Amino acid sequence: MNFMTSLHDVQRQVVHMAGSCLTFIPMRQRGTGVSSVLWTILICASSVSIAADNHAPTLQGDRFKKLVPFRPTAQFIIGATFNFPHLGTPAEEIFENDFQVLTPGNAFKQTAVHPRPDVWGWKKADAMVEYAKEHGYTMRLHAPISPQCSAWAEEDHRTPKELLQNLEEYVAGLCNRYKGEKHVRWVDVVNETITREGKWFGPKPGVGKWQNPWTQIGFDESHPLRPPIYIKRTFEIASKHGPHLKLLFNQHGGMEKPMWDRAKVTVDYLRDADVQIDGVGWQAHVSAGWERIPGNMQSLDRLIRWTHARDLEFHVTENTVWMDDPRTGTQEAQAATFRAIVTKLAEHSKRGVVVWNVWQLCDSHIQRPQKKGTMFDTSFQPKQSYYAVQDVLRQYSEAVKQ
């Protein structure tokens, strides 16, 4: 074992120990001296990691948060995602220098928090909530009822009653646990409810596939849309148990018209039923050159206008730009796509709240690292995309000052 490997092992063990300790401390007690001790442990872990890893890069120009600082009343908000295992890595350092709004990956999903009856897993979620509080970050919890669910929920013999009980316990438990945390501002309530073809995304036989078992709870037969019962029920529970939270309807895909037509009708269905909904989210996992495909930018423009016309926020929640096509997947093309999306959001900030969240801060931290979808390569060096976004934010900052 060499010296660098030893440092990595120590860092991982110390972060794990701190997270395990946090599991046993009630949230209401985490402003006390006990919390300070644990965060001293995490700081030590970070120091060890920095000795073992490359430092975050020295970047040219103003950092993002200086150009577009977060304010609770801001109309244009920027944020980023990094995960619990990335504490103490250069990704954390990049985030600290550029962002003030954190979405901690998948630590809050059903599969992690309440995968089956009588089983709860709060370690990573609690650690990230406490971390954000200690650093003064605002949070969005990516905690939707969605296809990213546990194997227990996917089992073919699962009954509607069992699924509904697990859903209600999970959503109520999550909102109750963090309802006193004022820095937790948004939560993704549902995600990936509709296919690109405009159908309700449903279950598949077996376990381990990308599927949505929650539609088995049933459908609202009183409405022509026949929306799945779980959608409205999830929003109702989140509103009841998380009264300070802003609730988002998040959707994957591109700008497929059948998908968004159904999503819009679903949002109106919730509003007509006086169910709280505060924003619409689009994941924005796209390939380089996406903005050059005819109709895409026009459809995005119309979607944002439609959202703002209902006094809702519009969020780009998980932006990656894949460099997966050898013909078009260049750094220049990726930078142009990031630039186009962020520019469109900045334009609409005059009419309503827009939020841009970039998904991960290193190519090796995403689910498909071979697609190189982030603004930083596997050595945490910035790509042209970083400077393209920086330029958009600089122009926005200058325009606001005029």
Q: Where do the model's predicted regions map?
A:
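Short, acidic/polar
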Residues: F84-E96, N166-L174, P258-L270, F338-V342
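Glycoside hydrolase catalytic-domain groove-lining segments
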Residues: P224-N250, K257-P326, A346, G352
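Structural preference for beta-strand elements that scaffold enzyme active sites
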Residues: Q75-G79, V101, T138-R140, V184-D188, ...
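Aromatic-rich peripheral "rim/lid" segments of glycoside hydrolase catalytic domains that contact
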Residues: D188, E192-S222, I237, E291, ...
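Substrate-binding cleft and catalytic face of glycoside hydrolase catalytic domains
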Residues: N97, V101-P115, K124-L248, H252-G254, ...
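Acidic-and-aromatic substrate-binding clefts and catalytic sites of carbohydrate-active enzymes
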Residues: A80-E92, Q110-K123, I194-E197, G253-A263, ...
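Bacterial N-terminal signal peptides
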Residues: S36-S47
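Boundary/entry segment of secreted carbohydrate-active catalytic domains
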Residues: N54-V101, G105
